[in-house]
A protein has these predicted regions:
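C-terminal accessory regions
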Residues: 100, 105-185
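Conserved helicase/translocase motor-coupling segment
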Residues: 1-136
């Protein structure tokens, strides 16, 4: 089992469809909707610290990140119908950096570990999928962090695939537990 199953968990938290529900999800232009949701709260609660975060995926809507991109705001990594955003410019104290576009940067798991935010939008990408057995599994080819991947040959071992899946699930767990006041996918 990949989770700590609790039969007493109140699953109604996922059924609340009201606008102010703690948990929710968007379909169709998800990056636009997550950013709009974050910005709407920012307009009403200027003191709130809200961010959009992302798994370490690449490919269709996200370009691969490189440490050489650093603080160059002209290099963007996330693209959706004319909306372009970049990864967080630093992993240390990212929430408090003085970058002009800091609130608009997309945070990675490495930038938000141990940090509580008010509202969090989380982009889940093609680095994880539901397999034919209905179970979550990682997709190494769509994961953009070369420091934590097995080689292609090593991924043929089911134990390595399982370990990598746990690693990716743990990254999403970190992202999905940052929001005090709400989370949207």
């Amino acid at each position: 089992d990949l989770t700590n199953y609790n039969p007493d968990f109140n699953r109604d938290v996922f059924r609340d469809k009201s606008e102010d529900a703690y948990f929710g999800y968007f379909t169709g232009k998800p990056m636009h909707q997550l950013i709009d949701w974050i910005e709407e709260d920012r307009n009403f609660h200027a003191e709130h610290i809200n961010r959009v975060l992302s798994g370490m995926f690449c490919c269709s809507t996200a370009d691969k990140w490189s440490s050489t991109h650093g603080k160059d705001p002209s290099i963007t990594h996330f693209h959706e119908d004319g909306l372009n955003r970049r990864w967080n410019s630093t992993q240390e104290n990212w929430i408090n950096i003085g970058d002009e576009d800091a609130e608009d940067q997309i945070g990675s798991v490495f930038a938000v570990q141990g940090i509580d935010l008010n509202k969090v939008g989380v982009m889940i990408g093609p680095d994880i999928r539901v397999n034919e057995d209905g179970k979550l599994e990682a997709v190494p080819d769509n994961h953009n962090n070369t420091n934590n991947k097995f080689s292609v040959e090593e991924m043929t071992d089911p134990m390595n695939q399982f370990e990598f899946t746990l690693y990716i699930l743990n990254q999403y767990y970190v992202l999905l537990t940052r929001g005090i006041d709400g989370i949207r996918l």
